[in-house]
């Protein structure tokens, strides 16, 4: 897995099955972990591959920046958050993601500058 390219044209590459994929990081809405599988949801489709949400968090913060982890199972691209309350994020596709109590302060601090949570 890697993130490649300039900031405006970054691509996240990964392998699912025996196929190598490359997606524009701007289209990534969120990563969701289920056991050792990662569901990568973009504006156009969903991909599944093996990995951990912790690995995704490190990779996206180092290589791309800006992704936030509101819950132990999710890593979210803030560009796709339409609104945020103390307990949940609503994404541009209507998906609601719970903000865990242990991560609430970090999320609030992060979003207070962007969208006034």
Annotate each PLM feature:
Residues 75, 104-105:
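Short, solvent-exposed loop/turn segments at secondary-structure junctions
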Residues 63-65, 99-100, 104:
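Short, structured coil/loop segments at alpha-helix boundaries
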Residues 2-92:
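Conserved binding/recognition cores within well-folded domains
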Residues 108-110:
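Short, surface-exposed, low-complexity cationic segments
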Residues 87-91, 95-98, 105:
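C-terminal structural segments of small proteins and small subunits
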Residues 115-117:
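Charged phosphate-binding loop/patch that engages nucleotide di/tri-phosphates or the phosphate backbone
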